[in-house]
Amino acid sequence: MATGLKSRIIYREVPSAPTEGSYWAGTYKLLIRAKSIPSPFGSTNMVDTTTLEDLVETQEMGRRSAGSMEVQGAFEKSKKDDMVSAEGKKLDFCILYGTDGKGSEGICAFIGQESFAPDEATDDHLTGTATVSVQTVPKWIEDDYTVTVEEDENGYPTSITLAKK
C-alpha cells in the first residue's frame, strides 16, 4: 500500500491554444505545500427506483457531485502571491498521487478555479487554505503523461513539467 507522502496538487492557467492530443502537457506550479489533499471526486447520489410492486427500496447510482476541495498547507508569500493573481481564472489542475512527487500511483486532472485565504495565525505555524472548485469531470491521465520535477536542495519543487508519452 502506498502512502500519500509527496503527493502534490499542481496548476497552470488554461492554455489559449492547447496542443491537439496532448492537452495536459506543459509546465505547472505547485499550488501549496499541502498538509492533505481532499478527493476531487464527490460522492455519487442514489436515484430511487422503487415501485409500488417492490418489497424493498431499490436504488441505482446517479451522478457524482463535483464541489470544492479545501487544501490546507504552508503559508508562503510566493505561493500566496501566485494564487491571489490566479483567482477567478480557469486553471488546469493535476493531483500527483504517490511517494515520488511525480504521480507514481496516479495522476488525476481537471479544470477548475481557486481562491486563497490565510488561516488563523498561531504561535505554532502559519497556514493558509486554497479552495479549489472542480468544474470538469476529473480524469486519470498517468498512462498518457510523464512528470519531470526539478527540486531545490530541500526537496521542494522548483519546476514541474508534464509531457505526453
Regions found by a protein language model. Give the residues of each.
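A structural detector for beta-sheet-dominated domains
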Residues: 12, 31-40, 96, 135, ...
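Viral virion structural and adsorption modules
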Residues: 1-4, 133, 137-165
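Acidic glycine-/aspartate-rich tracts in secreted/extracellular proteins
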Residues: 17, 76-78, 137
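A short, polar/proline- and glycine-enriched secondary-structure boundary/capping micro-motif
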Residues: 23, 82-83, 143, 159
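Surface-exposed, hydrophilic segments of mature proteins
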Residues: 16-22, 103-109, 163
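Short beta-strand and beta-hairpin "edge-sheet" elements
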Residues: 96-143
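Solvent-exposed edge beta-strands and adjacent loop segments
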Residues: 1-72, 112-125
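Structured, beta-strand-rich domain cores
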Residues: 57-102
